[in-house]
Amino acid sequence: MNPKDIYPDILKDIKLMQLASVRDNKPWMCNVWYVMDEDHNVYWISRETRRHSLEIKDNSHVAATMHPWFDKGLMNDPGQAMIISGQAKRLSGEECRMPYELYAERFPKLREFQSLEKFLNDEGHHYFYKITPDEIIWWDEINFPENPKQEVK
């Protein structure tokens, strides 16, 4: 069984990602609405003034996780999660076109929230950010109970 055959169906229903950034050896975690392309690059929108955005500007190393919520707790609810570490950056200009379309497909209100033209011209209140993964782990206690840590990249 290949984890790449499993997680796309699970992740399609998970819209919230936990994003970890760091500055001066002090980690920070936040939640953002995300999309992922076929190459596992991850995109989200945020203001430049948010703590995670400021930290990414100074230090591009980030980590992120996406997972279903668990109701039963330890030992009663096997876990599944995607864990990513990589480099993040703010996108500008034409770099925003493809993630805008992906994001608008998943979150249709984006078109009302901020136009593509504003992103392309770096004129909006929100900007696109991208994680290019260095490492991807699919943690799956359901399909791989003896070895839940499955390396994807």
Protein language model features and the residues they cover:
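Extreme N-terminal tail/first-helix region
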Residues: 1-17
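Alpha-helix boundary recognition
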Residues: 11-12, 57-58, 104
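Short beta-strand segments
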Residues: 14-48, 56, 63-68, 76, ...
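Residue-level detector of flexible, active-site-proximal loop/helix-junction positions
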Residues: 26, 71, 95
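Short acidic (Asp/Glu) patches
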Residues: 47-50, 65-71, 105-117
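Charged, gly/pro-rich active-site loop segments
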Residues: 77-153
